[in-house]
Amino acid sequence: MPESKPDPSVFPPTAPPPRLVASGLYLVATPIGNLRDMTLRALDVLAAADLVLAEDTRVTAKLLSAYGLKAKLERCDDHASARAAEGAIERLRAGEVVALVSDAGTPMVNDPGFVVARAVIAAGLPVHPIPGPSSLLAALCIAGLPADRVLFAGFLPAKSGARRAALEEVRTARQTLVFF
């Protein structure tokens, strides 16, 4: 049988290859202690990203290096999230792929990245979750407690008075409680 050639009208020789990852903001979960917990889809998104927003660029640079990936990194911590949101929206409007990662686990869980996601959603641009490691779910799995009703209370305040008040708020809760 003769070898078939691709139809040049579909993919002309000068056309760029099709993108495997569509433009959008991708909330990419990262490992929480074992680099082998990274998902293949997360690696695909990070490889395709025009920009990776990171809580700590040094931590994310090590992660990318472990997988042989290179990406433009920008800081997205408590002090830079508003500026990162503006830059992300500009890039997304230009058709680029922007990934948002936290230092460990799933972005948006006690993480300043929510400022970026909220702004992108408000701008009517696409946001895609890339699931993976989650310390919240890992804690529930090993606790041996019912997980059908759960209250996640995040980090308790550092000051004792505020911490007592936060615990008092949930003292009568009938759900399994999870704190960081």
Predicted regions and their residues:
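Beta-strand/loop-alpha-helix module characteristic of Rossmann-like adenine-cofactor folds
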Residues: P2-A15, A22-S23, S134, A138-F180
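Short active-site oxyanion
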Residues: L46-V52, G124-H128, L177
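Short glycine-cluster motifs
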Residues: R93-A153
